[in-house]
């Protein structure tokens, strides 16, 4: 599931880099903003006793928090990035500006919701419990599947399929690809650049909100965590090939396995096979 979350985050960074030509270091805070919106709405829905059975209430409010995240991304573009785009500033300038946006957004989030841990998971935590798995299979070892893991995998598959269908099959998606390949030629072909920018931020805001919310549900929400999450997300985008959406997805899983499998799983393995005085 961590790989799915990194993949969605890396896709958001890749879309901005490919179309708008800069590395958006504020993407982690956009994810945090989307998660914060989900948390606040979840608390409201829980107080109103609006739930979705065994699934987390956060899934119910996710469409609303996606809209709020998109609006925030569009406001940031309108009042910050648009100026530098009109000035035809170099990519490195936009990158530095995105770092400023990152710190501003992080401060805004901590001002609204505070810097501490926020747990917004409710509903049934497990789709399959270890003892139920043992009873079904007769095996000695148990297997546990959390509801957040199931939701993460399903939403990731749906979003990836929809994104690639949009980019490859729709007129707007093809216009975005043409604009990213050659902006001057795309403008001569009658493509509206402002519309392309609008759609880009809509996609970015959606991916950021979903990825951030799924990460917060699976672990817990703490604003500073998303600041640090930028590094593995960028690593995933780079490993998969900068500007390559498919590579971003693969990179997300490569980085997640590198972090979780190599960093943690093999510690116990080497602890048992190496001499005590090693």
Task: Please give the residue ranges for each predicted region.
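Transmembrane alpha-helical segments in multi-pass inner-membrane proteins
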Residues: 57-63, 198-208, 212-278
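Membrane-interfacial amphipathic/re-entrant helices at transmembrane-helix boundaries
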Residues: 1-9, 37, 48-60, 87-92, ...
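Membrane-embedded helix boundary and interhelical linker motif in transport proteins
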Residues: 19-23, 27-75, 142, 270-271
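Hydrophobic core segments of alpha-helical transmembrane domains in multi-pass membrane transport
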Residues: 35-40, 65-72, 99-109, 155-164, ...
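Single transmembrane alpha-helix segments in multi-pass membrane proteins
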Residues: 1-41, 79-89, 93, 237-245
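Helix-loop-helix "hairpin" substructures at the membrane interface of multi-pass membrane proteins
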Residues: 2, 142-221, 226, 248-250
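Alpha-helical transmembrane segments within multi-pass membrane transporters and channels
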Residues: 49-101, 250-255, 259
């Amino acid at each position: 599931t961590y790989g799915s979350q990194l993949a969605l985050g890396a896709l958001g960074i890749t879309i901005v880099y490919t179309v708008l030509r800069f590395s958006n270091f504020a993407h982690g805070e956009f994810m945090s903003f989307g998660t914060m919106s989900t948390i606040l709405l979840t608390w409201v829905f829980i107080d109103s006793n609006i739930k979705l059975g065994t699934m987390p209430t956060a899934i119910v409010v996710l469409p609303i928090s996606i809209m709020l995240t998109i609006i925030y991304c569009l406001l940031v573009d309108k009042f910050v990035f648009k100026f530098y785009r009109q000035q035809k500033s170099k990519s490195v300038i936009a990158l530095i500006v995105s770092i400023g946006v990152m710190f501003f957004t992080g401060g805004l989030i901590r001002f609204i919701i505070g810097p501490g841990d926020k747990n917004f998971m409710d509903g049934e935590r497990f789709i399959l419990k270890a003892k139920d798995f043992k009873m079904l299979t007769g095996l000695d070892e148990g297997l546990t599947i959390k509801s957040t893991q199931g939701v993460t995998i399903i939403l990731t598959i749906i979003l990836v399929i929809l994104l690639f269908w949009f980019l490859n099959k729709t007129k707007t998606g093809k216009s975005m690809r043409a604009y990213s390949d050659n902006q001057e030629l795309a403008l001569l072909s009658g493509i509206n650049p402002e519309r392309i920018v609008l759609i880009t931020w809509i996609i970015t805001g959606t991916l950021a909100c979903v990825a951030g919310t799924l990460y917060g549900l699976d672990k817990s929400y703490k604003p500073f965590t998303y600041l640090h999450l930028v590094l593995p997300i960028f690593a995933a985008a780079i490993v998969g090939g900068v500007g390559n959406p498919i590579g971003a997805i693969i990179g997300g899983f490569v980085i997640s396995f590198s972090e979780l499998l190599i960093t943690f799983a093999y510690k116990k393995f080497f602890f048992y096979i190496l001499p005590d005085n090693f």
